[in-house]
Swiss-Prot record:
This is Cingulin. InterPro entries: Myosin_tail. Its main location: other. Residues 9-378 are annotated as: Interaction with TJP3/ZO3 and myosin. It comes from Xenopus laevis. GO terms for biological process: microtubule cytoskeleton organization.
Amino acid sequence: MERDIYGDMADQHIPVGQGVQIRFIGDLKENGKPRGKRSKQDSYGVAVRVQGIDGQPFVVLNSGDKAKSSFGVQIKSQEPYLNASNTSPPNYQNYSSKPRGPSRSISSESELPENPYGSRGYRPSSSHYSSASDEEQKPRGNIRGSDGLSSLPRPLQASRREELRRSQSHSSLLEPDVEESYDYDHHYSERSSTLDTTYSQSSRDSAWSRSSQKKIDNGDYPSLGYRSATSQQSTSVSNKTKKNGLSTSSPSNQSNEDIDTKPLSSVDSLINKFDIKGQVRGRTARRSQALKDERKRSQSLDGRKNYHDTADSREIIVEKQNEVQTMREPVNASNRSFNRQTLERGDISKTRLTKEWLDQDREEPVILKQQRTVQSEFQLKSTPDLLRDQQPDGSDPTREMIFGILREGSLESENTLRKKTSILLEKLPSLQVQPGEDTISLGSQKKELERKVAELQRQLDDEMKQRMKLETSQGRPKAGMQRLEIELEESKEECSRLKELYEKKKNELSAMSQELMEVRMGKEQVETKLRTMEDKLMDSKEELSHLRAKGGTSPDKLALLKELEEVQDELDEVLQIRQKQEELLRQKDRELTALKGALKDEVANHDKDLDRVREQYQNDMQQLRKNMDNVSQDQLSLESERQKINQVVRNLQRELEESSDEISQWKEMFQKNKEELRSTKQELLQMKLEKEESEDELKETRDRFSLLQSELAQVKKGSVDPGEVASVRKELQRVQDQLKQLSVDKQKVEENLQQREREMSALKGTLKEEVSGRDRETVRLREQLQSEVMHVKKENEGLAKESRRIQDQLKQVLLEKQRHEETVHQRERELSVLKGALKDEVSGRDRETEKLRERLEQDALMTKRSYEELVKINKRLESEKTDLERVRQVIENNLQESREENDDLRRKILGLEAQLKETNTFCDDLQRAESRLKDKINKLEAERKRMEDSLGEVADQEQELAFVKRDLESKLDEAQRSLKRLSLEYEELQECYQEEMKQKDHLKKTKNELEEQKRLLDKSMDKLTRELDNMSNESRGSLQLLQTQLEEYREKSRKEIGEAQKQAKEKTAEAERHQFNSSRMQEEVQKLKLALQELQVEKETVELDKQMISQRLQSLEQDIESKKRVQDDRSRQVKVLEDKLKRMEAELDEEKNTVELLTDRVNRSRDQMEQQRAELNQERSRGQDLECDKISLERQNKELKNRLASMEGQQKPSVNVSHLEAKLQEIQERLQLEEREKATLLSTNRKLERKLKELNIQLEDERLQVNDQKDQLNLRVKALKRQVDEAEEEIERLEGLRKKAVREMEEQQEINEQLQTRVKVMEKESKRKPIRPAHDDDLSSDGEFGGPYDPSSITSLLTESNLQTSSC
């Protein structure tokens, strides 16, 4: 008996429960200390991947592998169901399972960890058990059939710590393991493939199985507690399995377990939807029985046997049961009633809904049929309701201990004993410490916040993509941009708010985890108490055994037996109540499984959406890189064009400098010529003075001659004295000498005049040459200007096209254009003011020239009038010449020649004055034209520089706008998506939360009812507390071991994740190295590594960084707006430059006209010079005639003197004296007239000289004014150059700021990428963590007292977070 009890305790050493039993197995291999017999063939891997919207898990089971250590689920193995007689092994050939090829999951294994457990082949099984459908799963007992021979000893079960294996993500669970051998002589084990989430009666079933084992060993035939759905069906079904020679144990007859097995249609439909999917994530096929030494119990929580999913397999099992029933003796009435009930249930189970569901399960997709042709006959249904109801072959140790104590020395039936044990165990859960209800709510809130963050991120991505599309087509209007900015700000605020909530909930979760640890500590204390109670039970057993050994039936013993019978009755009643409650719980669990199936579909869709978003993100990044390459190429082309324009401008500046040097040289030459002309004018004035002096002397001689004549007249009248005659002769000689001297002086003056005329002709030749050279230079300059203007026009046209293209792309930059236009308007106003001043100056010069022309015309009229008068005088003199003699004629000719010479001189002077004026005006016009051209060239250079700067800034702005727009659009898309997701998930979570609250209320009511019943079992609880304490100590040790293993696994997973992150970063770095220089990329990689380390250490700085990023984004947006305005202003400047070019063309045409007028003036001046030369020749001829007249007059004087002498010698007045006197008077009158004419000519000459002086003064004033204006223009040019230099410096500064902003944007993008990776990591961690609070209520119930969970379920919950990483 002690062997049996301790064997049971060894079998029960594994803490079991009614949830998913998960264990680490690496510790056993590492330590090399196996803890008992184990069967690696029956270990299964479990991968729980939480990717649902509300964090609900779905399950993927993978078969184990001997090679690798992993997490797994230890699932119950079945023993053969044989009768006690020594019968031969059954014929398994007809039901042997064929080895099947590997059936892989649909999900790719590249994304998930490798399955360390290869799928194994199924051993041939005599009874095909499969997973029961959720509507057909009812409480059933575990069959512990005896061996083929009753004499064989019962082997101990596998030790408490079975070696478990890590689950693979989506590897097949249906691959056959051909390596394992098959033994027909021994029992075979069927590999368990069911992990059901429904609750079952594991404790009672295990107790029944142990009692049946003991009764079989003793030769009795107790009822075997086989409670599968097929065994509960009718035993009167046609006996098809007799043909195959199968023998099974008969179903146990229980009258007290009437359970409703009607299927739930709504749950069935959901499960049907879930199971038709092509992706196989559920349990494997049927179990195969192994040898008893290799047998290992599953860890399901209800210990149910597996079911076939088809009706035929159920009929086969029923037939096996009938065969066993025919071989056994009839059992009591309760068993018969149970058979009747199972028949009714079998009839109900084969309803239309169940058949449709089974038929649908048999219909697989075409792809899976092709993959699984070999295993199509044995393929079983896989559902996500597999995490519960897995239990080892023996039930929990407390139940077995209580059952063994009650069974010792009792004569009651086994059912009553089991009912009493169940009642005792149901009274115990009040000792447990239950955690608060806030854990589930906090977990759900945390999941909700995480989903909201993910949804916001997705919406931001969507919005960024939409904005990218809009940007490629056309720039969006300003209103849309503002609206998007407002939405972005709102989404940022919502993100910050959600993050705050996330942090808050995280803190609350940490507090709740601490509370959970306290609860676990309380649970461990309860377990220690249970162990002490077990010790007490063992002591009581020993006492009973001693009493039995003594023999006899004492009255104490009878009293104890009666008490035990009463306790058994109470236990039976409590078991019935508990069965009803478990049925309700199973129904709710089925509904939960259906919801899990729907969640699985949503998770798959979510994965697809994530893959699609990743692909789209990669495409967007590639497009971004292409756009960046195009922009860089455009920048290079613009820089080359800019350099060309700079070269052209420099060449123009050089040519301008050369032309300015030439103009300065010409001006110096002109000033020298002017000075020479002035010197010549002074010499002419001196000559005129000398001439006046000679004329005065002539007047004096004439006066003397008149005195002589008067004296002659006196002599004629009176007596002529010889002394007076002698004196007269002396006087005449003296006069003649004076005349000779005057003639000599006159010749000298004429020679001087000729010399001056030669110098003037030479000067005129030089002036003509200078004028012709100046004309050639002006023509050359005009041609150069025209060619440069054409080149500038072409360049401006190209720039205009480029600016139009840029304007099409940057229509949104309006404000900056307005500012630029204002500056352009100011410059235009200044130019208009300058133009007005220049026009006023030009108009003043024109007025002055008109005044000078009028004066010259008046002078010409005066000269004409004087010339006409002289002509008249000449006509008169010619009329008088006929009366006069040859002397007279000679004198008249001399006088005419002198007049002509005077006229020629006047004309020459007037021509020279006109030439001087024209040359002065021409020089002034040239200076003005040169100044205008310089101003225009300077303006064009400044405008070119501005255009170049504007183009550079436009290119930079394009890049910045493209980056900013893409970032904003991606963020807005992600925000919108996240908002939508969060709204949907929030509604779903509210519904789930309401349902869970309802379930909690219902559970509370049931708990209150159980607490009322607990009072009846207080006495028995005192005895069992010690045993519970011992058990809690053991579970505490196991939990600590599990926690250490969890920490090791977490460290491993973190290392793997870090390695994966490093690999991803290296790949991204390699992709960027192809685009940029290797040096930059290395620095950026180092920065990224440092940033990652800082981000991992400093979590709290993320929010501050995001705020700074938002502020930077706002500042960048403001900069972008200002740059848009500048771009608009620059485009307007381009238009203004085009208008200015047109104006300059018109001005060039005007200048051409002015040059033509100047050439006409030059031609006129040449004609005037020729006329002056002719007049000079005429004056020379006149001078010669005057000299001839002088000679003739001298001869006449000599003749007169001779006559006077002859007259004096004769001393008699002759007749000719009167005639001579008359002639003398006429000559004197003529001389007087000539003197008058000379006086008038001198006055006119003096007036002309005064006018010349005034004109020279005016010319000098004008020259000074022109120089002043030139200096002012030079100052303006220097100021403009300074402004241009300042503008260039400002542009360089802006370029530096732009580069800095680009660097900051790139750094911000890197930070955002790091944040995204960090958020993903946090999401993964949060997906691992929320499972614990979701199951806190489950942990609160003590599975070792018959509740839904036990310490093993705690380990499963602790390892689920790590299993996520393996599946991911």
